[in-house]
Amino acid sequence: MISVALIILFLAKVISGKSDDFISVNPETNMLIDGYGRERFFHGTNVVVKHFPFHPETTGFNKDTFSEDDMKILQKFGLNSIRLGMMLPGYVPKREEYNETYIKVIQSIVTTAAKYGIYTLLDMHQDVFSPKFCVEGMPDWIVNTQGAKDFPMPLHKPFNLDPKTGYPYPEDCAKFSWADYYFTEAAGQAFQNLYDNVDGLRDEWAQFWKKTADVFKEEPSVIGYELINEPFCGNVFKHPTLLIPGVADYLNLQPTYDALQKAIRQVDEEHNIFFEGVTWDFFEVGFTEVPGGKQYQNRSVLSYHYYEPPDFSKKLNFEARLLDLKRLKCGGFLTEMFTVGTDFNSMFEMFDLCDKFKQSWHGWMYKSYGCIEQNLGCLNMSSPGKESIQIANTSRTYPQAVAGRTQSYAFDIKTKVFTLVYETVGSCKSGRTIVYFNKNLHYPNGYRYEINPNFKVTPSENEYFLYLDEVNKVPNTVVTFKLFPLSFTDSEDIHPVTVMGDKHLSENHNENEKKKK
């Protein structure tokens, strides 16, 4: 007989929307799911520190922090996920020497973020491999350019090196855009030697991921491990066909990812592995299967990015990625797109398409964290107070957990109307759907909702969420939920009222009436 204590514990998890189970993938629907079988959606931001100490400050609040103050801001604006830089030079500054202090800081960020309902994707970030190539990513010991001309040939004659660092001088690096340095022999050869396991370098990379996974293997708030950010194709001077979309994915990345996956699975069979193709896979990616093969489809997520340029069509990009997901039978996640700057129309268009194609996303980026080339962070430190964070622009009404099969959802940034349609399924162990909404930002005069059929709708105590609970658990029921803002006129004239019919529930929540009481 099940004990009363166990029943209470289970109900507490359902009510809070939390679970001790890991996020996984339904290979047939390509959706991320939790332990209750609910489809899960994530909106978030990147937290990546590309220079020493390779992690953010964890106390206080300033341009270099990711502390509990920052986490509270993300929670308020409905950002339930971060893509956190899990940096190879931070954890393994010297070959076979692991910095345990670094991993403890990363671990503390993960566990503290979980207290605020924030999940973490651990991202081994790099851009053009190394500071030796004017950018960042890998520690010096893993940079092997054997067989290549001196950097940055053929882009330019060899740069002089700073004798203190061994790196090119910043004024020389500034002569070209950082992305141009991918097309140097030295950078391409460094990638190629890593993929080919020259001097056992790929084995060392695999060991990095094995040790990382061993630390986080029991942490359910970790969505997964992203093996490498924006991998380059390899040495295109010796193998120019690698520039053909899909070729490098199959020839270089797929066997490399299999090797990394094998190392991770020695200690962690539960977490998702996020894998990414080259950045110019405008159409189909070149992978023939997920890392590790078909048996890992339910723990594999294709990571992809969108920037214009080099990308050229938002809609075509999503359509191509959905075809990849169906073919590979894995999940998908847009792990980078611009959520900074002033082109809000383009950003809102991306958000609308993410809703349409039911894709989770991470914006680039939360703060600049001192990175000169990426000094486009969301934090405006010239304005007083934490509310100057422009990340409010990313706050949208959306479902964080859906107790069934999501058919569609959409948020209109102009009217603030939100619509969710889903079908209940018998295999779902929870009847609770969770909708995030920013009451102060989008519904300052109050809100009303309509739901069909007659489900119970309850706001959370902190009024960040609306809970949609099945009254009678009936599979294959199509549920339609709509949320509307009250206008100023409405808020003066309409009193809170609940109207119930056979299949329809409508309720107004009036801020002015609440204040009068």
Swiss-Prot record:
It is found in: Secreted. GO terms for biological process: cellulose catabolic process; glycosphingolipid catabolic process. Glycans are attached at N99, N298, N380, N393. Keywords: Carbohydrate metabolism, Cellulose degradation, Glycoprotein, Glycosidase, Hydrolase, Polysaccharide degradation, Secreted, Signal. The active site is at E230 (proton donor). Pfam families: Cellulase (PF00150), Glyco_hydro_5_C (PF18564). It catalyses: an oligoglycosyl-(1->4)-beta-D-glucosyl-(1<->1)-ceramide + H2O = an oligoglycosyl-(1->4)-D-glucose + an N-acyl-sphingoid base. InterPro entries: GH5_C, Glyco_hydro_5, Glyco_hydro_5_CS, Glyco_hydro_b, Glycoside_hydrolase_SF, Glycosphingolipid_Hydrolases. Residues 1-17 form the signal peptide. SUPFAM superfamilies: (Trans)glycosidases (SSF51445). This is Endoglycoceramidase.
